[in-house]
Regions:
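Cytochrome P450
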Residues: 1-386
Length: 386
């Protein structure tokens, strides 16, 4: 199945007013007040601008308080970024994902779903967090601690309950709480992993960073970055994709009947429609701008007619990919995009084949201003044995 099939006519095959987005009503933007850039071409141009600098997502706080630590790859630019990116790229290639991590994805999915069937019910958002943390932890090298405990620690750090409001006092409280939770993450998860990799290096990110002379503080900030990108956001996407597929029997059937490429095409279209991170920030000449990924991914000149409808066979403009700008673009495009899509496909394919599986309760939809993205909680699944 092609990711970009051609319909028999240029006419929009569905209602022009149709809006399949489930997160639109919750979208609010991020913590920074900045002029918005909304068109697809303009947003992509800023993302590809080599003179633009990262902003938002605690960039200023981390760069200010990191002491002598190197900034994580998320905040590097130019030659420093290219050098570090090339050093870690081998952990995210399609071949490595297929040969090294697919078995882990399958085993983890099978274990989680066996528990769902045994218990008769579970929250999809909790299952997806454990799935995402397990896979990302293996790639990064955070394998010397309890996955369930690490999931809770990361969830506490990035959850909306961690947000304390606006203003100087709120910023101070946010920083203090963040430092405490960061120290717990280091003590429980990062420090044991560093010790194990020093004793016996493996093919993972922490071993690579140690070989490059990174200090424990350097590695902590890098793991924090991967914790957000590789774990928390993937958790939200798996839950969102599962919600769409469970509520639309015809889409579920299409997904289960598709080959691997066809399943990825459906997931990419869901991600285009529901980008997990709705706003990215950049420092450019003249100040800071807010890049509205949701608006850009709904730009009909780029993604085709009926931009708010879920249509895996939509015709896009040339050089516009399936997920649009949901994974970013330019030098900071998400390196783990293939991992996220692959593990989502593996997990959801197995989930949706469970006999008697039903969505008992649609999730609560919230908004996390720290990552400028939606949060889905209490998405209840049940398995009816009859």
């Amino acid at each position: 199945m092609s990711a970009q099939l051609q319909p028999s006519s240029g006419r929009c095959p569905i209602d022009h007013a149709r809006d399949d987005r489930k997160s639109a009503s919750a979208a609010q933007g991020g913590l920074l007040a900045a002029p918005e850039v909304t068109s697809f071409d303009a947003v992509r141009a800023v993302l590809r601008d080599t003179d633009a600098r990262q902003a938002g997502f605690k960039a200023e706080v981390i760069l200010r308080y990191r002491g002598r630590a190197r900034p994580p790859i998320l905040y590097l630019h130019g030659e420093a970024h290219r050098r570090q990116r090339s050093g870690t790229a081998r952990f995210f290639t399609p071949r490595v994902v297929e040969t090294r991590y697919r078995d882990l994805m399958e085993r983890t999915s099978d274990a989680l779903l066996a528990r769902l069937v045994r218990d008769g019910s579970a929250d999809l958002d909790r299952l997806s967090l454990e799935m995402a943390v397990t896979v990302a932890a293996e790639i990064v090298g955070l394998t010397e601690s309890d996955i369930a405990g690490m999931s809770r620690r990361l969830d506490a750090f990035f959850s909306t309950t961690f947000q304390t409001g606006r203003g100087k006092f709120a910023e101070l409280m946010s920083f203090v709480l963040g430092q405490w939770r960061m120290r717990r993450f280091y003590a429980k998860d990062v420090k044991p992993a560093i010790a194990a990799r020093r004793a016996a290096p493996r093919e993972d990110v922490i071993s690579h960073l140690l070989s490059e002379g990174y200090t424990p503080l350097d590695i902590l900030t890098e793991c924090f970055t991967y914790g957000a990108a590789g774990m928390v956001t993937t958790r939200e996407f798996i839950t969102m994709a599962g919600w769409h597929l469970l509520e639309r029997p015809e889409l579920r059937a299409q997904f289960l009947a598709a080959d691997a490429d066809g399943q990825i095409a459906i997931l990419e279209e869901i991600l285009r429609l529901e980008p997990v991170v709705g706003t990215l920030y950049r420092h450019v000449e003249g100040g800071t701008v807010a890049l509205d990924i949701r608006a850009a991914n709904g730009d009909a000149t780029a993604v085709g007619t009926c931009p708010h409808a879920l249509d895996p066979e939509r015709v896009r403009a040339p050089r516009v990919t399936g997920p649009g700008l949901a994974f970013g673009d330019g030098e900071h495009r998400c390196p783990g995009a293939g991992v996220a899509l692959h593990e989502s496909a593996v997990f959801l394919d197995r989930l949706l084949r469970i006999p008697g599986l039903k969505l008992e309760r649609a999730p609560d939809v919230g908004w996390n201003p720290l990552v400028a993205g939606y949060e889905l909680r209490n998405c209840r699944l049940v398995v009816d044995p009859t």
